[in-house]
Amino acid sequence: MKTNIPARAARIDWSALARALLKPLALVLALVLVVFVVAAPSEKKRSAPAVPMMNKVLMIGDSLSVAKFGDVMRDFLVSTCGARNVAVFASCGSSPENWLRPEPTFFTKCGYREQTPARSVVLDRRLHLATPKIESLVATYRPDTVIVQLGTNWMDRLTTSDTPQKEAELSDIMDRFIAAARGRRAVQILWIMPPDSSHFSKRVQSTVENLISAAAQRDRFETIPSRRITHYVPGKTGRDGVHYNPEASEEWAKRVIVRIKRTLPLSEIYAGQ
């Protein structure tokens, strides 16, 4: 007779069960790790977005910049650098020496432009306003770039008296002007030379161009020779052989702007600090 021996309970393989449970858990953890690694750099990039770095620009000129040419130039500078970074001054009848502090104050009688982040004044009628001094403008606005549109009014002086002594005097004025425009900072300077004129002789126009070009070589600044991109046709371009009508002024400004874009890095994008 057989003794009743209870049947041995089936043995559970816990190691196989653990392996079965750990596999999906490991897969989930791996996916989480991959997502974290991929997302981390993009999060870092979002924390440092590209920030526009704008140059501060000061532009000064004569009656040509009081008129339409000045409108177009200012619109371009504001669209490129922002209104808070642009200051434009123009005084009808002025020459480089009139903007220098040691020289007597020049009062314009035919037009004035002053457009800054704080105010906007454009007057083309007869008045009696003092031309500001470039030393004060540089100290106030601290420009990175100074754009100059001056020189046409020297042609009157050279028409009546063009001597080596006179040209030496004007060369000295150029050097003083550039030194004042730079101040103590590494300011970039661009000189827009006078456009073509049917009133002044080619000799006088070339003399002014040569004075500015020689100063550019000595003092290391950029120039735009406007005579190469303009042609004054009496009755079409203007009436007096010197001043350009609105249409001609705008066309001249557009051609100048094309050259400015090739010459000056007025605005760029950089990784913010």
Could you say what each language-model-derived stretch is?
Residues Y141, R176-I189, A214-F221:
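A structural motif corresponding to the C-terminal end of an alpha-helix
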